[in-house]
């Protein structure tokens, strides 16, 4: 497996410096600049994690009383770092359009695998489709301010009035 991964990592070549491409591959090697940025970000990891957790708490607190919004609940025994701030609403696509029209970078959850063109699976997965049609990813960057989060939550409340 390691050898196969190395082939993929090196543009499909078995060895560096050899121009024979054994199979389709990719260039997964980091540039020095990317590595330097990664090292700098690792040093600030605790700050990023703290901000993302606080942002999620603020979103949940501000949206808790909105009947149409179901908050994504994490296992309380786990210590998660929210990659995304997810809510569920009756019609995600309409809310997302409204938020985007008002300057908020909201998006859908990932399209279900069975709906991806490369898989072409014509089966019915109603739970997956329901989650996709109702899930909204709100901004989650550590750089969000309290004002940003309050603005987003006020827009959501206004949308459902």
Predicted features, each with a name:
Residues 1-161:
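PLP-dependent aminotransferase class I/II
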